[in-house]
């Protein structure tokens, strides 16, 4: 090799583009390493070269510098790259761990400065690392994938995308081993396809579509965690035939994609990890955005924005990057309170700039959706206010100086509510209403009046706002406006624009692709009723009505000085004017007037009886509307507060708790059920639709009424029991797409938020009367474990033990346990307590053992460990245990080690036979146990590899080689000896080196051809001549001694461990608590 200074200087310009910027430490590190390498190896022959490097890499410092130098040569000299890579693999001491870590850092920080040759060679090196199964390459692949920027169709970016596509297509099997990487690749390429609609990209787009569709369909279980952001991306490519068919399957045949997939709404309810959003920005752009949001003062941002505009938005195609930036800013950048109080530029100002500077109608429509996307599915119990804050602040601060921005955003918000997903319009409406309620509750803005009642809004938009957000708008006059039929303009779907096959062509399409014609035809028309809210969801302070009216209201505002203690439904009524009176038949009008005056049960019952006896032609539509609105108004005013649920369940207390007008209507339904008059049923439907708490109050009434009737007749059964059919009749009458099961889940969810004690009181009856819905219901079970304390848990377990309550059975336990892995720690502890209370055998859910991760699922692992202590080792249990991945190179899997050591105290010989048979089955050649291998496909899917088996045995050996030798008797059994010998014979050189101490435990067999072959290796099987062999001899002697001891002594000895044991060091600092259902700001 040439060691001259000229040769070294020749390489200096080949890795990084030369700029006027001073080299940083990262660049200098590679330069120094290469120069030192050249000086050391100049003029050496190949033999001397390898001998010298082999001696140098034994030292940590030299090993790192030589590795960097070889990487430098690979990235700068394509002709010598294959030979240099071979040298690198021969000289590495850590399985190329140092190399992959430094390459990942290089890509993240310096990729934009790499030369074209360096970028090309980086892809070549990534391909070689994947081909040779090097560990931890996934992080490097993820960093390179981030560099494939959206909105960039430059030759360099397209070459990178094509290179990555080639690698992932060629090494598909490697890709599918990593669930997160599968999701990232699918998410990335669906986003990139959006930019490749130009005619010059036809071939590339076809390859991308073929690859990503295949990946999505084959690995849809890994796609589900991508959540709602993936749906947003899919809408932009929905016109491609392959994606159109995927949409049809997701909408109409979801089970064909994945047995556990229930449809698009399941994805929309799943929050997308911010890591996927972060992956769609290059590290360079991410650093610039972080600088803009944390260092630039408000008012000084223009020059930074101009620079950013010129650098990243300088082509028509680059405009699509705006949506990625908006989603990242909303979901990933959550400023602290100190920053919010400072003069740093706020997020809403940056988003406002991204919207106003957009020049492409397609991108602008998608950017609006990106801004409001979290609003559509907002759940105050789970979602973060920081995700909806920018949207309201952009409109609020723009209404004065930039009214056009606020008007277009308000118009978009009104239309997207009805047209985003017509089938679930009510859920979208609830999400947006929840967002506004949370905004007012957290006082993000004082109130909505300056925005919704601004004089700068045109008349049509104001009318649309009052119709869509009636609960938040101040009425224009004192007369209550009955919701009429939908206006033609309101029913016209807001059209989204998508790039057509020609790139610049704009194609109108309903947003998102959920608006497939067949899907829209199946959807129902928008309801004009008020949205559903529980009274305790929103406690924002509202201003008393100040509008002067000619009609007196039913409740006087001056009688209430402080409305904080009133239910929200009553507070709303303080702001609403009286209902315009309509003439009714005399008898019916008299009962209605009396009910409006008295607002009592005794006046409501005659009204219902009179209404039921009215003829078909007795009332017209206007009269029906007036009657319905009047009754609902009183029902809302007389809703019981939280205290109506009595602490003492005496007959008097229970009777008093259902002495409200709403329960009078339920009493009539209870008596008549299917024979209930049509007009009365229509009124009940309107009440349940407009009063969100009415659903669970029916459940409460059914329990109380049945209980009271049963006590009076001295029986708890028969016709006086909890009549579940009444609830079903009312659910069937609702003009809703929700099934009875979904109605139950919604009502129980509201009930749990409203009154936990009532929820727990009703729940046993729900499990008994709605067994088909409630049994194995993970949604309700999550509500249950999320609201109970230790006393409640004890009561539930008592009921289960007495046979009064069954929450789940063996058929649904696996799905329940899998979903519980995301619960909080106490919730998981409750789940496992309930599993034991139900006496569910371990064999029904043992299949989840390989899926559990030591660092993420400690609760489940400890519970299963305690259950395994009561089990005897079986072939299936041992197979599942040893199929677990070893997460730590040094510590191994403490769960597996603990189970094996415990079993060794009593079942050492049996355990040895099982493990030996499993290990032998991995090597079919000359295997005496070949016929014993399991044949079931389910077992083959989780069968451990030989590498996993040897890893677990090695860590087990380390854990028990000290002390009194407890557990080492596992290795002295004849079957295990033969298995280790056979494993040694079929192992590669690297495996023999890695597990040398383990193989050393196998005794010599003079007649065995296996040992003969081993004798020819460089290791030899002679008397121990080094420390390792001496340790092996001692371990074998200790094993023999331990095998002769009784189990009690073995148990005592099992507590002794050495410092380098694979068991956990309990004195070290505890790991941070695992985060589960946390908000994004955390």
UniProtKB/Swiss-Prot annotation:
Swiss-Prot/TrEMBL keywords: Cytoplasm, Nucleus
Coiled-coil intervals: none
Pfam families in UniProt: HEAT_Ints3_C, Ints3_N
Superkingdom per UniProt: Eukaryota
Role this protein plays: Component of the integrator complex, a multiprotein complex that terminates RNA polymerase II (Pol II) transcription in the promoter-proximal region of genes. The integrator complex provides a quality checkpoint during transcription elongation by driving premature transcription termination of transcripts that are unfavorably configured for transcriptional elongation: the complex terminates transcription by (1) catalyzing dephosphorylation of the C-terminal domain (CTD) of Pol II subunit Polr2A/Rbp1 and Spt5, and (2) degrading the exiting nascent RNA transcript via endonuclease activity.
Family assignment from sequence similarity: Belongs to the Integrator subunit 3 family.
Protein name: Integrator complex subunit 3 homolog
Species name: Anopheles gambiae (African malaria mosquito)
Top-level taxonomy: Eukaryota, Metazoa, Ecdysozoa, Arthropoda, Hexapoda
